[in-house]
């Protein structure tokens, strides 16, 4: 079987990370996979085809030719119009090809206005044209059904492939977080309003009795919001306590040097970085946004949770975690076991069950 993983754009975001991880997962199971895209900021690895084109009609033709040239048997693509493009290209190729559309984010963050009936209906049609729709979390699947985007029969949940290394038998560890001189905090993701770095800055403006460094790791998606975050840093006198790393690929390595991961997102689907933190045994504090964080942390069993936009709640969670060795080490020692849900082999098996 030859599987194409199609995304209109490859950048440093979470969906692109899914594309690369999915290809890596299939290759580890000796399944031929090809990435195809029409725009790329960066390209990592082999078996990647860049077809530079902005016209949707031409994209269909170019993708059809790609299918025939590479002898593709199935396509995994994203939500929105990519599913329709993939299905039309598959039909024109003359091959019986299954197309799977993967939903990575809740529909109200797809960029539609309330009155944008035409594009909403086109997105629904695109999902309907695909053979199957995959949601990356159970919460997201339920929302897609409830809001009428897809039927219950059409959609299933498959967690993203995040963990590729073997998870060894765990040995209990102990870190004296109460007496650590400086707490290194990882905040990973695009700098944009949905990731809510502003809430994190406001929360840590209230922390006076512990030394810490906020490590913002990720590219700038919204320049105006980035300026707002920097103004908040100055307003809260945090200039010497914040480090901007920019986009990075070595997240596992970075997490190993951190003490805590914090996510204050206003909306997610299945935040990969939280799974990476679990594998690296880094305790997590997260907002309760829709969807994904509560599911990953099992409603607080594997990390602390605060309400979206509640910077007072975030500062309270931080103080609770770093001033309680028992709590901190409980989360640390539960983390890797939880990360087993998100291994590459489980994802591959689930996708093959749909495709075969």
Labelled PLM ranges:
Residues 130-154, 162-164:
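A short, active-site helix/loop in glycosyltransferases that binds the activated sugar's phosphate group
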